[in-house]
Amino acid sequence: YGHQAGDACLAKVAGVMKRSVRTPADLVARYGGEEFVVVLPSSSLNEAALVAERIQTNLRETAMPHAASAVSETVTVSMGITLSTAGDTVTGIIARADEALYRAKQQGRNRWVKLNPLPGV
C-alpha cells in the first residue's frame, strides 16, 4: 500500500475492530504505525479472546486485498492480549501486550496470544 491507500486500509481495519468490541465503553485506538490498542474495561482474558476471535472473523469476511503480504492475500491481524492488575502501569500493560503480540507473530501471524500477568493462573 502507498501512504494514502495504507491509511485508508488502516481506517477500514479500525472500523472492523470497532464493530467487533462488546460495548460503547470499549476503546479502539491507533497506537502508531500499523498498531492498534483495544481496551476492554472489566473483561477477563477469555472475554478478550472472544473479541479477538470476532475481530479476526469480521476482518476475514471484509476480505481487504493485501497483494504484497507473504502471509495472506487479504489483510490479517496478529494480537497480543493481557489484563491489567493492581499496581500496573500503562507502560507495563503495553509491554505485556507487546510480548504477547511478538509471540503471535513468531507462531505464524494472523493469530492472537494471551499473556496472563498472574503467575500460575
Predicted region positions:
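Catalytic-site-adjacent helices and loops of nucleotide signaling machinery
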Residues: 1-10, 16-17, 32-33, 37
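Alpha-helical scaffold within the catalytic cores of cyclic-nucleotide enzymes
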Residues: 14-18, 47-65, 98
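A short pre-motif secondary-structure segment
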Residues: 27-30
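Short aromatic/hydrophobic contact patches that present stacked aromatics
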Residues: 37, 78-81
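Catalytic-core segments of nucleotide cyclases and related cyclic-nucleotide turnover enzymes
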Residues: 46-52, 82-121
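PAS and PAS-like sensory/regulatory domains
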Residues: 73-77
